[in-house]
Curated annotation (Swiss-Prot):
Inactivation phenotype: Mice lacking Ccdc66 are viable but display degeneration of the retina. Initial formation of the retina is normal up to postnatal stage P10. Malformation of photoreceptors develops around P13. The degeneration progresses slowly until 3 months after birth, when the outer nuclear layer is reduced to 5-6 rows. From 5 to 7 months, only a thin outer nuclear and photoreceptor layer with severely shrunken outer and inner segments is preserved. It is associated with impaired photoreceptor function with early visual impairment detectable 1 month after birth and progressing slightly until 7 months.
The name this protein goes by in its record: Coiled-coil domain-containing protein 66
UniProt GO cellular component terms: axoneme; cell junction; centriolar satellite; centrosome; ciliary basal body; cilium; cytosol; Flemming body
Post-translational modification Phosphothreonine, affected residues: 114
Pfam families: CCDC66
GO molecular function, one term: microtubule binding
Organism for this UniProt entry: Mus musculus (Mouse)
Biased composition, class Basic and acidic residues, residue ranges: 473-491, 752-782
Region (Disordered) residue spans: 76-103, 470-491, 577-602, 738-794
Signal sequence range: none
Protein's UniProt keywords contain Nucleotidyltransferase: no
Function: Microtubule-binding protein required for ciliogenesis. May function in ciliogenesis by mediating the transport of proteins like BBS4 to the cilium, but also through the organization of the centriolar satellites. Required for the assembly of signaling-competent cilia with proper structure and length. Mediates this function in part by regulating transition zone assembly and basal body recruitment of the IFT-B complex. Cooperates with the ciliopathy proteins CSPP1 and CEP104 during cilium length regulation. Plays two important roles during cell division.
Length: 935
């Protein structure tokens, strides 16, 4: 709960100034809390309007900000159920926001004592009531009508004095004598202005209609006055004037709750009776009012239906003539209602069009006078001044533009007063009509010439727009024609493609049929050729066996059993040929069906057969394919014949090698041969098409992937391989301790000797250079820094002393090494840089030598050393070695520094060696590639 919730603020006029004060606090009862939860009224900022017709000196800060439609329904209920502080706020100003929404909003806070005020207000319904216009049929009309009453000046003064006595705030009546005389009956809702004659006639008719029920109203009025006097006496005793102090109202509680509930029930009952009386009065007044007026037709229709129902209930024996008259009357009324609605809709449309046109004309042509606009302006002024006479801005109900005026009936002020006030306003508006207004429009400073120029521009722009529209239409038409043409071409293309597809399909089917016929013919020819070859082989084998028998007979062997075996074998072979001839059609069908698979599957035929098939015509290919083996028809006949001949030769050689006396061994060999042939025939019957795997030689040699590279890439690869091997050999040689001592003992004589050897091998280098012709041998590749040149020179010269196992490889590497040496010698002649080679030559320095290092620019440094001195060092290396003989060292610090540097160099060298051995990437090759790419 926020600080300040529940406080009520008021404005009070003191010495002509508005001041904000706290109103006295009253505790709500449980019923009021429940009803407050049902109908919550939100708080909004204070809104005060000071006008000339102000009737109030205080204004409540509780201003309802609730949904308007919900407020319509709950106006009567909140007036009956909420026991809160009630003030009727009278203000002549208007609220345009609510007038457009057809809303009735009453600003209220109802207390237990002012519910008596509502009763008095409701009992005063017998006063002369102005004529009401028929309203639209909405569900809240009766509720609104029953909750709206009129007050006389005496009753209003009585209510205000009662509220002052009860301590709910001071109400100062600031109205003048002129206002008291003019405002005899102020109504609580905002009613639009009506013509004078309508108000006068309605007033007279309603007073006449209200006279029959006066006696009932007097009875109700008398009871209400008695209750009001009792309540006033009790309020005078209980509620005394309390100052508007926040501390004087804290902790005050409501008493006599049971009495309050009884009063509220009695008031509600009386209100219900009064609502019923008002409803009857309204029906009576509407029944005898002018039924043919177009504005009253809508409500009269409902009244006619109610009257007809009542008549049927009261007078059961109705005549047919009366019913016919009523039906005609209802039809005529319906027709009039429809015509009136149609006419109003048309007038509304015409009026809205004319109003829009006049508004734009006034806005753009301020030099012309528009009487229609002036009349509308005067009517708007009249409306504003008439609305200023209304009591509260929260109770306005103005008609919408699209609807009929629907003021709630029974609560209207006297028309004579309104007409008296509206007449001077109308005269003032008419008097101001011909005068020009002071609003400056867009064309106020333009002369007629500029207006004409604008008109010409507008016409030109319209013509331009028409031309653009015509052009757009033309483009659209062209696009449509192009689209139609394109669709037509696409359809023709689709038809042509369909015809071509059908033609191709038909041709394909014909080709397949021809291919099948050709394959069938080929299979037939193949089978015939196969049988002829088989018969020829059998005949040749029989002739060989007969020749063998004759040879054995000449040598004196017994050949009777061989002759018997030969006859049995001939009979068996004849039987097998007959059976195979019977199975020829089946084989042809099998081969014809299996031929497509044979084309796509693994080929087990002879490779030479495929070559012949490509080269020879179909007949030749048929003959070649027809040559088959007994065990497998797919094996070529030539190959099978060769294998059979080879087997027979082996058997003959074995028979010749055996002893002639041992007839049994020879007989067993013949029996084995017979069994072998019988087994082959059985296998052929079981699976005549069993493929023979791994009997054909491959068509091409196996070519490794490295040999499939282009020629120049293969050359580069070979060169890099040779160079890499050379570098690895150099590294191995340098790290070899034997070669280190040799490297240490190199003299200028040895280098000159190597140069002569390299010159002698120059011819071999040229022979190698001619087929290679790669950048690795060219001079541009070796145009690198002097350090790399000398290191390459040293490593390549060391290759000459390395023993190689492979003689061919030795020749190649030596020739390449000599070539590199020659080229590097030629290019390193003008160089002046002496490299620092990582060797252990530092161990053999003379201790007596100066500490300072000689200049690297001295070309004669190495030549200055005497050959005899170097030879002496090499001879006495073990004796004068500082590591072996530490007594020779005079400068220990220098020796330690040298040893430390040597250890670091050795570690680096070993690490480089490991990297090169593992990655097989030589250091010098990378350096040469980098230098060549930079240049």
């Amino acid at each position: 709960m926020n600080l300040g919730d529940g406080l009520k603020l008021e404005t009070e006029l003191l010495d002509g100034k508005t001041k904000l004060i706290l109103s006295p606090y009253e505790h709500k009862s449980k019923v009021s809390v429940k009803m407050g939860n049902k109908f919550k009224i939100a708080k909004c900022p204070l809104r005060t309007k000071q006008t000339g017709h102000t009737l109030k000196s205080t204004q409540n800060t509780y201003i309802g900000n609730e949904n308007l439609s919900q407020k319509k329904i709950s106006t009567l209920d909140t007036s009956q159920a909420k026991p809160e502080n009630s003030r009727l706020t009278f203000s002549p100003s208007t609220d345009k926001q609510y007038s457009e929404k057809d809303s009735v909003r009453v600003q209220k806070e109802i207390s237990p004592t002012t519910s008596n005020i509502r009763k008095i207000i409701n009992t005063t319904g017998t006063c002369p009531v102005a004529k009401q216009k028929p309203c639209k049929k909405n569900p809240t009309a009766e509720t609104m009508n029953s909750g709206l009453v009129c007050l006389t000046q005496d009753q209003l003064r009585q209510i205000l004095m009662l509220s002052v006595n009860q301590g709910n705030g001071s109400v100062c009546l600031t109205e003048t004598g002129e206002e008291e005389a003019s405002q005899d009956s102020l109504h609580l809702i905002n009613i639009p202005s009506q013509p004078k004659d309508v108000n006068d006639t309605g007033f007279l008719q309603n007073t006449e209609a209200a006279s029959p029920v006066t006696s009932e109203h007097e009875h109700v009025h008398r009871r209400a006055q008695e209750a009001f006097q009792q309540c006033e006496q009790k309020a005078a005793t209980e509620n005394e004037w309390k100052p508007a102090d926040i501390f004087s109202t804290l902790g005050e509680r409501e008493r006599d709750k049971s009495l309050l509930e009884a009063r509220r029930a009695q008031w509600k009952k009386e209100l219900d009776e009064q609502v019923a009386l008002k409803k009857k009065e309204k029906e009576a007044s509407q029944k005898w009012h002018n039924p043919w007026k177009p504005s009253d037709i809508e409500c009269e229709k409902s009244q006619v239906h109610d009257q007809s129902k009542e008549a049927r209930l009261l007078e059961s024996p109705c005549s047919a003539i009366k019913q016919e008259q009523q039906r005609k009357w209802i039809e005529e009324l319906n027709k009039q209602v429809e015509d009136d609605q149609q006419r109003k809709a048309e007038e509304r449309m015409i009026y809205s069009k004319g109003e829009e046109h006049d508004r734009w004309a006034v806005h753009f042509d301020s030099l012309k006078s528009h009487p229609g606009s002036q009349s509308r302006l005067s009517s708007q002024l009249t409306h504003q001044h008439l609305e200023s006479l209304c009591v509260s801005p929260d109770t306005q109900e103005l008609a919408d533009v699209n609807g009929v005026f629907t003021p709630p009936p029974g609560v209207q002020a006297e028309p004579s007063e309104k007409e008296q006030r509206a007449r001077p306003v109308l005269e003032m508006a008419v008097s101001h009509g011909p005068k020009t207004n002071f609003l400056r429009s867009m064309t106020a400073l333009l002369d007629p010439a500029q207006i004409e120029e604008r008109e010409r521009r507008r016409q030109k722009q319209l013509e331009h727009q028409k031309a653009i529209m015509a052009q757009v239409e033309e483009n659209r038409r062209k696009k449509r024609l192009e689209e139609e043409q394109r669709k037509k071409e696409e359809q023709e293309l689709e038809l042509r493609l369909a015809r071509e597809r059908e033609e191709m399909q038909r041709q394909y089917e014909e080709d397949i049929l021809k291919q099948r016929q050709r394959e069938e013919i080929m299979t037939l020819k193949t089978n015939e050729l196969f049988h002829t070859m088989q018969r020829a082989q059998e005949l040749a084998q029989r002739l060989k066996q007969e020749q063998r028998i004759r040879e054995l007979a000449q040598k004196g062997h017994d050949t009777s059993r061989l002759i018997q075996n030969l006859g049995a074998q001939v009979d068996y072979k004849a039987f097998t040929t007959i059976s195979s001839s019977h199975s020829d059609p089946e084989e042809t069908a099998d081969t014809s069906t299996a031929s497509p698979k044979k084309d796509t599957g693994v080929q087990t035929d002879d490779v030479n057969l495929g070559i012949f098939n490509d080269a020879l015509p179909p007949c030749g290919s048929v003959t070649e394919k027809g040559i088959r083996n007994i065990s497998s028809p797919e094996i070529s006949a030539e190959f099978s014949g060769q294998t059979d001949i080879r087997k027979e030769n082996q058997e003959l050689s074995m028979n010749k090698g055996t002893n002639l006396d041992k007839e049994n061994s020879w007989h067993n060999g013949q029996c084995n041969q017979y069994r072998r042939t019988e087994k082959q025939t059985k296998l052929m019957k079981k699976c005549p098409k069993k493929p023979a795997w791994n009997i054909n030689k491959p068509l091409k040699k196996y070519v490794p992937a490295s040999a499939k590279y282009p020629a120049h890439l293969q050359k580069e690869k070979e060169e890099k391989k040779v160079q890499r091997q050379m570098e690895l050999l150099h590294l191995v040689e340098r790290n070899n301790p034997e070669n280190l001592s040799q490297n240490r003992g190199i003299s200028p004589l040895a280098t000159s000797h190597r140069e002569t050897e390299s010159e002698s091998r120059l011819h071999l280098i040229k022979k190698v250079e001619e087929p290679l012709k790669t950048p690795s041998v060219s001079k541009e590749r070796f145009q690198t820094s002097p350090a790399v040149k000398n290191r390459t020179q040293q490593t390549q010269s060391n290759v000459l002393h390395l023993p190689l196992k492979n003689n061919d490889y030795e020749k190649e590497t030596l020739t390449l090494g000599d070539g590199h040496t020659k080229l590097s010698d030629e290019m390193s002649e003008p160089s002046h840089f002496i490299p620092y080679v990582r060797t252990n030559e530092i161990y053999y320095l003379d201790p007596d030598a100066p500490l300072s290092r000689p200049s690297t620019q001295d070309n004669q440094y190495q030549k200055s050393h005497d050959c005899a001195r170097e030879q002496e060092l090499f001879d006495s290396d073990h004796i004068r070695d500082p590591l072996l003989n530490p007594k020779l060292v005079k400068n220990r610090d220098r020796q330690q520094a040298i040893l430390k540097g040597l250890s670091e160099l050795r570690q680096g060298l070993l690490q480089k060696q490991k990297e090169l051995e593992t990655n097989l990437i030589p250091l010098t090759a990378n350096q040469e590639d980098n230098f060549s790419s930079s240049f």
